[in-house]
Structures are given as structure tokens and as C-alpha cells.
Amino acid sequence: MLPTLDARLTAAAELVLPGKPVADIGCDHGKLTAVLAASGKYPRVIGADLRPGPLAKAEQTLEHAGCKDRVELRLGDGLSVLSAGEVGTIVLAGVSAQTTWEIIEQAPWVSQVGGPRLVMVPATRHSELRRWLWDCLLYTSDAADDLLCV
């Protein structure tokens, strides 16, 4: 059975570029990961989390949704689980604004022209994340159209 997403995760899912691989970083329970995989719109879906517990929960969610075989789960810190150019969209949902920008700062390739679309759904401090994006990325990046904050 496919999980139901709340309005913010539904909005995030709708912003993922179809036809390209996608990564759900900080996938936690795996609901968004499962919905993305079950949609059939993406050639590859990666779910990643920092801790084994949430990754195990994501695996259960994927199994119940019948799409475990369409997802690669990775254990690791932020974007260290990805290589530049590996995915077309990265979703960072459910972590704080500060954690979101710390993750982005550790992987400068995400804000380069031709980099992936970055869909951010911070759990807290939305306005601070938007301000940080404006100050640190939007002024210096021609890729601003692919930096989306829900």
C-alpha cells in the first residue's frame, strides 16, 4: 500500500524533474521515496539517511508499498552519498533550515550551473533558509531556477 503524503511533501514530489534520477536525502520513514519510486517517472530513486534506524523504517515502507526493488537505499551524511551529476533532482525534506544549508555547503557542486534541481522542505525556520539561499546562492548562481524551497 502506497503511503499518503502531507501537503508539503506532495508539493515537493511535484517539483521533481521527471525522466531523471532523484535522491531523497534524509528520507527518514521513506514515504516520499516510495511515492517517487511507485510513480514510474524516474529511472532511478535513491533514499539516504544518516542513521540506520530511519533507513530500516524506509525499507519497511518501501516493502509495504511494493517498490523496494526500485529504490537504492544508502547510509551516509547528507550529500556525501551522491556523486556530482548522479541525479537530476535532490530533495531535502524534514530537516531544519540550518541542517539544510550545512548539507548544501558541504557539496558546492549542487549550486553550480548544470547541477541538480534542489527541492528543499525545511522542518523549521523556512524564512531563514530562503534568506540564506538568497544571500549565498541566488546572487552567485545562474542555476537559481533549480533551487526550490517549499
Protein language model features and the residues they cover:
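S-adenosyl-L-methionine
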Residues: M1-P18, A34, E59-A84
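Conserved SAM-binding loop of SAM-dependent methyltransferases across substrates and taxa
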Residues: H29-K41
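Conserved SAM-binding motif I beta-strand of class I
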Residues: R44-D49
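Short alpha-helix immediately C-terminal to the canonical SAM-binding loop
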Residues: L55-A56
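Conserved beta-strand signature within the Rossmann-like core of class I S-adenosyl-L-methionine
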Residues: G114-P122
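Conserved small/polar residues in nucleotide/adenosyl-binding loops
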Residues: Y139-A144
